[in-house]
Design a protein with these regions (language model features):
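Primary recognition of N-terminal secretory signal peptides and signal-anchoring hydrophobic helices
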Residues: 2-207, 237-248
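SH3/SH3-like beta-barrel fold
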Residues: 198, 211-215, 223
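Extended acidic/polar, glycine-enriched regions
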Residues: 222-238
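Glycan-recognition patch characteristic of GH18 chitinases/ENGases
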Residues: 235-339, 344
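Hydrophobic faces of well-ordered beta-strands that scaffold small-molecule active sites
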Residues: 254-258, 280-284, 315-319, 357-359, ...
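Short acidic catalytic loops
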Residues: 282-288, 349-365
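Substrate-binding surface in catalytic domains of secreted glycosidases
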Residues: 292-299, 343, 366-490
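Conserved small/polar residues in nucleotide/adenosyl-binding loops
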Residues: 492-496
Length: 496
């Protein structure tokens, strides 16, 4: 009986053992699969969103852009709009000539679509190409020649890696013999690229066990923290932009504007400045653009310049845009208008012997800034050829005038004059200082954020406003007083 029971129990035991073994194998297999890194790769074209053989992905400062470049004749080109807004605004599309104007320290070059005479790619193609849909493209190799950036092109899949920002950039080195950069932070995530020991990666973000990185050839993904070194800062580099040599003075500029509206005003200059001390530059309001073709009016006087020079002062003739017949937003878009203004100014400068030009174009609209910048580039290039200083007046940087691109202006011109006054003006809703100390401090601080301190001249007012507020009324009025008037008013109140 017992023998029979043993015989019956044996198969059951075997089955139980088999069940345990199968279960254990399943658990082991599950655990192995769970912790085994995935081996599947993500297709490069899918990662870079490339849909055809001529599309080129753009990776800028570690970010894959929606914007894409194109291959033309096997070489990478980027749309003009991208180049101008993201890489180098010196590439300026001129609607009148239907070409790209490139202003450098050597002058202005005109790059016409399809013309390789002025500039061409390493492969001999024109620097600028225009597609049938009207889109204008610029060779990235040509852009690199004139722009402060690092750039590399890779094929299979087509992509361009660009860096034009270096502040706060860190890198890490691969320490494992082999490692993978994955699409997401997890061992099952798709592999984007294999990396080898010693490879340098752009370090973007720390996520504990995983770090966000970018490979040298443009793949941004995640790598296990244990596979790389501690991040280290990349040494700051000196900008390699085209060097626009400034014409500067080895002393501080102490400038006064002279409101000169007639020949009589010119004649009064010597008497007005006879007892003036410390001033080494005088800027008379001699020139104004009077119409849409770029005609300028002039009160320039060689005798005025001679007297100023005898007193040890330079003369920087001022040109304004105050005539309503001239609209800089639309009129400066024409190369012929810009050229006409510049030619007349330089002819006047040569005739009267003045030392510089002061540009006082005010109330600029955002739409006109690209054309204004191009005007300044062309003016400075031509003026420097005659050894003339170029200075530009600009309002105090405020949120609503940031579109002035003061840093870009400062790339070309010699001095930037911030008009640190009119904090409160005739139309202000409240009484207040024309130029309070905090207002002036802010002006200087904001200017020196985007340009060297020795390029900034701070304009302060030699006038004030006396405000009148009537009891029970919300309206306020003001009267402008010059220095003498302010002094006399102060003496009256002191005596009272």
């Amino acid at each position: 009986m017992k023998e029979q029971q043993k015989k019956k129990a044996a198969p059951v035991l075997v089955v139980l053992i088999l069940i345990v073994l199968v279960g254990a194998a399943g658990i082991v297999s599950f655990l192995i699969n769970r912790y085994k890194p995935g081996t599947e790769y993500m297709a490069g074209n899918e990662y870079f969103n490339l849909t055809d053989e001529n599309s080129v992905a753009l990776i800028q400062n570690g970010e894959l852009l929606e914007e894409q470049a194109v291959l033309i004749g096997g070489e990478p080109y980027a749309a003009y709009t991208y180049v101008e807004s993201q890489l180098n605004s010196c590439f300026y599309w001129d609607e009148e000539t239907k070409g790209i104007l490139l202003t450098t320290s050597g002058g202005v070059q005109t790059l016409l679509p399809g013309d390789a005479a002025v500039a061409k790619t390493p492969g001999g193609q024109p620097a600028v190409q225009q597609e049938s849909d009207g889109t204008v493209y610029i060779s990235l190799d040509v852009v690199k020649e004139y722009t402060d950036l690092d750039y590399a092109y890779y094929s299979d899949p087509n992509r361009v890696v660009i860096r034009n920002e270096w502040d706060g950039v860190e890198q890490a080195t691969v320490q494992s013999d082999t490692a993978q950069v994955r699409q997401k932070g997890g061992i099952k995530s798709l592999i984007l690229a294999d990396v080898q020991k010693g490879d340098t990666l752009l370090y973007l973000e720390n996520l504990d066990n995983w770090c966000k990185v970018m490979t040298a050839d443009g793949y941004t993904g995640y790598i296990q923290t244990e596979d790389i070194s501690e991040p280290e800062a990349i040494e700051a580099r000196t900008a390699k932009k085209d060097s626009y040599e400034r014409i500067t003075r080895d002393h501080k500029i102490n400038l006064v504007w002279h409101q000169s509206t007639s020949t009589e005003s010119n004649d009064a200059m010597a008497e007005m400045t006879a007892e003036m001390t410390g001033v080494n530059v005088i800027s008379p309001t001699w020139f104004s653009v009077t119409d849409e073709t770029g005609t300028i009016s002039s009160l320039a006087s060689a005798d005025y310049v001679k007297l100023a020079h005898e007193a040890g002062r330079e003369v920087w003739g001022l040109i304004d845009n105050f005539n309503e017949a001239f609209d800089e937003t639309t009129d400066l878009a024409y190369a012929s208008v810009r050229s006409r203004i510049i030619e007349q100014l330089l002819a006047e400068a040569a005739s009267c012997g003045m030392d510089g030009i002061n540009v006082d174009f005010e109330n600029l609209k955002e739409a006109g800034i690209p054309h204004y910048l191009q005007f300044l580039r062309e003016l400075t290039s031509a003026a420097h050829a005659q050894n003339l200083v170029v200075s530009v007046d600009t309002p105090v940087p405020q949120a609503y005038t940031m579109y002035y691109q003061r840093g870009e202006q400062a790339r070309f011109v010699d001095y930037m004059i911030v008009m640190a006054y009119d904090e409160h003006f005739a139309g202000s809703e409240e009484a207040g200082s024309v130029s309070s100390l905090p207002f002036v401090q802010q002006a200087v601080e904001e200017m020196t954020r985007v340009m060297p301190a020795d390029q900034v001249i701070c304009g302060i007012p030699f006038y004030t406003r006396v405000w009148t507020e009537k009891f029970g009324q919300s309206a306020i009025t003001s009267e402008v007083l010059g220095m003498d008037g302010a002094k006399n008013l102060s003496l009256i109140h002191i005596s009272e």
